[in-house]
Amino acid sequence: MKVVTFGELMVRLQPFNYERFVQANNLEFSFGGGEANVAVSLANYGLDAAFVTKLPAHAIGQAAVNSLRRYGVDTSMITRGGDRVGIYYNEKGASQRGSVCIYDRANSAIQLAQPSDFDWDKIFEGVDWFHFTGITPALGQNVVEICLEACKAAKAHGVKISCDLNYRGKLWTREQARAAMTELCQYVDVCISNEEDAKDVFGIEAEATDIYGGKLNAEGYKSVAKQLADKFHFEKVAITLRESHSAFDNGWSAMLYDVASNEYCFSKKYDLHIIDRVGGGDSFGGGLIYSLLTGKSTQEAVEFAVAASALKHSIEGDYNMMTVAEVEKLAGGDGSGRIQR
């Protein structure tokens, strides 16, 4: 099975030891980005995963490419050119202080990319699945056009398409997001959202839910999933459910709605003590794609995806370093965290 993901791979700069930006003297250097994170997860699970983007040909661009190669991601379809690698600064939250993300992505290679930079017919030869997120079209209208061309080509090649809505208010307005994502979602088969994105992008929300007070009405998300599926004719809708008690402690679960069977499956809920939550949603997406490609049932798929994401919250950095066996062990009920000897 081969999966292609498309998006921006950025430099991640982060203060050490939960320091704030204003007190930090040093920053930790790594790489990450929503769709790249999904590709790493899938490569770790043994699938043929390729990441498509545009990166400069200089040393930082090459370091970004190498960060994917080391985990087995196919980087052969990355276009090289431009001058900048996008940057995001991440200040990790602690206790009641939430994390802060500051973007420095203007004029990055992918933000300035043009549709002619990518040969989607060639890229989708022999591909089974295509994944992108709502973060990528938020980079500009030219990138919306690239995403549209990718989706049209994927459909022409019989490729399944998944999209994580991933609304980012620092990149575009709700009105801009709704216009672009309404057009793009017409091509999507599997939609991934969270407790906020459906409301932010499409104005669809669950009743009796207070995301900031840690109160979620899980049953209300059946209606959210149904409305999304009806609007865009999705085959499946997954919604992750995060109960945020503090920066360290979250409740984490998800629901997967299968339209054909009219089946709503809820995962077990995990009580997380978080090491790093960045990439948590991407690891859910990677787990879900893996599950659907390998024939898991709706219940098995949502359990695997949530377990994969729960484990990612214990790992520093954007990328999820877990194996299929480790995820299946947790999904099967072993969450003791006991030492392996």
Where are these regions (language model features)?
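Conserved phosphate/ATP/ADP-binding segment of small-molecule kinases
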Residues: 171-260
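A short helix->loop->beta-strand "cap" motif at the edges of active sites that frequently abuts
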Residues: 155-160, 232-235
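Conserved N-terminal subdomain of the carbohydrate kinase-like
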Residues: 48-137, 327-341
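Short catalytic helix/loop segments, enriched in acidic residues and glycine
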Residues: 20-39
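Conserved post-catalytic alpha-helical subdomain immediately downstream of the catalytic base
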Residues: 264-334
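Positively charged, low-complexity intrinsically disordered leader regions
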Residues: 1-20
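Alpha-helix C-terminal capping segments
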Residues: 30, 38-48, 291-294
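Beta-barrel outer-membrane channel/assembly domains of diderm bacteria
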Residues: 9-15, 37-44
